[in-house]
Regions:
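Helix-rich interaction surfaces within compact, conserved domain-sized segments
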Residues: 148, 153-198
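N-terminal cysteine/histidine-rich coordination modules
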Residues: 1-56, 60-64
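Signal for well-folded cores of large energy- and translation-related assemblies
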Residues: 8, 81, 89-93, 108-112, ...
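Conserved nucleotide-binding/hydrolysis micro-motifs of P-loop NTPases
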Residues: 11, 47-49, 121-124, 160-161, ...
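Short active-site oxyanion
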Residues: 38-39, 94-95, 113-115, 148-152, ...
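Extended interfacial segments that mediate partner engagement and assembly in macromolecular machines
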Residues: 47-124
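Positively charged, polar, low-complexity stretches
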Residues: 101-102, 106, 128-155
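Helical mechanochemical/support elements of P-loop NTPase systems and associated helical scaffolds
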Residues: 39, 54, 80, 100, ...
Length: 198
């Protein structure tokens, strides 16, 4: 549990984002919470970080003069995106991600899909088809007596970003399939989605 510098609420670390004083006394995001030095924790959310900048919560929490970039919320989002891209690349190397509508659908039908990733610039009909495949599969699982089954569906990255991470061109649909590297990518996708939503 850590205290949010903005709201002063104690929250689990998973619900917070850490910032540290970097070179030249500038506040920088520490997305993995591993950097040395005293950190400042803020609720995991783009709006919360922007509000913390506006209210000078970093200087108040550190009790010191620090420089805070006006675009700190955007910088934190970029860092979270980069961590997701790195995790997706590792999942690809581990063989724990499939791409293309046909392979993704096969992973869903084989009950191997841990999460679905759709490019933010995908056509509406393609998005809808993949989403309905997931919903249909989850509904069938519930009918079979498997309660609480919800396969996450993320639209966080563009097709160019997905392609770059996976070493492919024009990636519109991808599915994380079961494995440790895929679990890591899923955790990073959930973290980024939470940051964007809040």
């Amino acid at each position: 549990m850590r205290e949010c510098a903005l709201t002063r609420e104690s929250k689990p670390v998973a619900e917070l984002l850490r910032f540290v004083v970097g070179p030249d006394e500038v506040i920088v995001p520490d997305t993995d919470a591993k950097a040395e030095g005293r950190g400042v924790w803020v609720t995991l959310g783009e709006k919360a970080v922007a509000e913390a900048v506006k209210k000078k919560a970093f200087a108040k929490s550190l009790k010191a003069q620090v420089s805070v970039p006006d675009d700190l919320a955007a910088l934190a989002r970029q860092r979270l995106e980069q961590r997701l891209l790195n995790a997706l690349s590792m999942a690809r190397k581990a063989g724990q991600i499939v791409t293309g509508a046909t392979k993704v659908r096969a992973a869903v039908d084989a009950d191997e899909c841990l999460a679905l990733l759709t490019a933010t610039d995908a056509a509406r009909d393609g998005r809808d088809k993949m989403a309905s495949a997931i919903w249909g599969h989850d509904a069938a699982a519930r009918e079979a007596g498997i309660e609480g089954r919800v396969t996450p569906h993320f639209e966080l990255l563009s097709s160019d970003q997905l392609g770059l991470a996976l070493g492919l061109e024009n990636v519109i649909h991808a599915a994380l399939v079961k494995g440790a590297a895929a679990q890591s990518a899923l955790a990073r996708a959930q973290r980024l989605a939470r940051y964007i939503a809040n």
